[in-house]
């Protein structure tokens, strides 16, 4: 009788653990504390990103590491493209991205960083949807 009671709980617990592992492996769930991506992503929104995202393109919104922080920005230029900023022209290295916040007046992004490029290795996901505001 005890064996039967244990097996009743074993399957749901195992399925829950497998489901949580798969969700954690595929999806990123995050919180956006700043207004740097407004109006696209409101300050205080929860977002869902995909860890496996395929080829990234100009216009994609990505989650990446920069100076020890996870940030969310839009790709403005990909490797091989040039970016004009003021009187300067920057060539984005292959395998890197130039990123901007949608709220240009309230975004610390590639325009202000010492190294303005985000290497592909620092990207952890691509935004698939905004969950809640």
Name these PLM-found stretches.
Residues 1-133:
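Extended hydrophobic leader/signal-anchor segments used for secretion and membrane insertion
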């Amino acid at each position: 009788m005890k064996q039967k009671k244990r097996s009743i709980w074993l399957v749901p617990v195992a399925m829950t653990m497998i489901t949580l592992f798969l969700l954690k492996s595929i999806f990123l769930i995050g919180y956006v504390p700043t207004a740097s991506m407004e109006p696209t992503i409101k300050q205080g929104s929860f977002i869902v990103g995909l860890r496996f995202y395929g080829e990234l393109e100009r216009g994609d919104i990505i989650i990446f590491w920069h100076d020890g922080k996870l940030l969310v920005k839009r790709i403005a230029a990909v490797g091989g493209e040039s970016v004009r900023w003021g009187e300067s022209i920057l060539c984005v290295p292959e395998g890197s991205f130039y990123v901007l916040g949608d709220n240009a007046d309230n975004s610390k992004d590639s325009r202000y960083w010492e190294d303005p490029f985000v290497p592909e290795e620092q990207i952890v996901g691509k935004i698939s949807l905004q969950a809640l505001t």
